[in-house]
């Protein structure tokens, strides 16, 4: 018996070690292939800014949560500022997702070889779609971890999970408001259903302790770094809510093809829990309060939330990582059928085939970086900029056939910036420039993108944005604006904001515009 137990334990250690290596390495590999400037460098620069004393909401306008950027600053602090430590951040979270999936499945007594298979396949599809730290992936991981925690709280009756759940939801929400807010609603709803039959003082205590600790940490950070509450309210709540009004339109029309058929493999992967949930409720509605059905409802709710979020986001398709996860739960509950081996084989094959398909179609071709139709072999080692970008394979959709030309243009811009000792603000999607030059870019926005990140004229909260930008120019004594094209979401930051007689525009080369500020009535009003 001892020998058998020892063998199983050693086997488990082997699978866990292999899972860590695979989940970390595969993301690390893809993080170095290709660049989408507007997305690839935003967290790179924000993490560097925080490390050097510039803080979100206070020093730069952001509707993205600060958690991602704070974690990146920590990675830079301990591992140095480089693309390797940047990629290691997202690779670590890919590994965390893989391990938590593995241990959650193991709690259902799924054989460890199957826990390993499903967790590995999920990690292959999770973070490598982008490779580098990205809000949608981080919030998805925090959200999935909160779902796992509630599933385990229901299954194991351990109170510690009730403490963990609000902490994970808090981290998720301050990574990105949605879908974290939707998951919070789902979890509160399922928790209430669970507590109707399983009310315990300990559960309430641990849950409130998690909520209290999260709120205390948030308020402490806000006061310590002197971040105005009004800025947080406007940037992270009010303006995004105004965007939500237009994003809701993206859900229309409500069509079977968009909501179901397009994501059919995800539905099929979860088909066993869906079937059992419907069957049990049909027999007796009050079966809904049974633990097993609450877990099914959690999984179905997660599916609906992720599909809704995918339809409302402007970013690339990424939710196919759910297929191996949901297939694993269908595998677990296949034992309720006589021909369970047939179902098990089906869900294993579905997971393998879908992983290969989506990996080849989206990940390997760097689809989310808009590089699908490009020859990635034309990429250039970005170490020509700096050793900080060593081994990054530089190629973008802006210069698909001549990355060397893009690099040459950017190197010329860097030289122009070096020569200018005036206080400057950089407006660019290539936000690595200030990091390499070890200067403050004095950027007023985490990402320069009208409407999606900050309001346009005539939109709600435009005056808030205008005041924020002009106050920053005055406070930081900015003399000149360096605008580096191409920009995905901006042309001229002053357009519709101040009159043309407040600045001179000098076109230095094909990608660089230098705007020198002049004395004018609008700028004087901020002095």
Task: Annotate each PLM feature.
Residues 149-171, 200-208, 292-300:
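Short hydrophobic alpha-helices at membrane interfaces in multi-pass membrane enzymes
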Residues 103, 139-156, 161-169, 190-192, ...:
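Specific aromatic-rich, kink-prone transmembrane helix
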Residues 161-179, 183-188, 300-311:
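Membrane-interface alpha helices of multi-pass inner-membrane proteins
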Residues 96, 101-124:
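Transmembrane-helix signature of polytopic, membrane-embedded enzymes
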Residues 129-139:
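Short acidic/glycine- and proline-prone juxtamembrane loop motifs at membrane-interface regions
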Residues 178-179, 226, 352-521:
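Extracytoplasmic
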Residues 106-109, 146-163, 275-289, 334:
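Membrane-interface transmembrane helices that cradle and orient dolichyl/undecaprenyl
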Residues 31-46, 56-71, 81-84, 225, ...:
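Extracytoplasmic catalytic/substrate-binding loops of multi-pass membrane glycan-assembly enzymes
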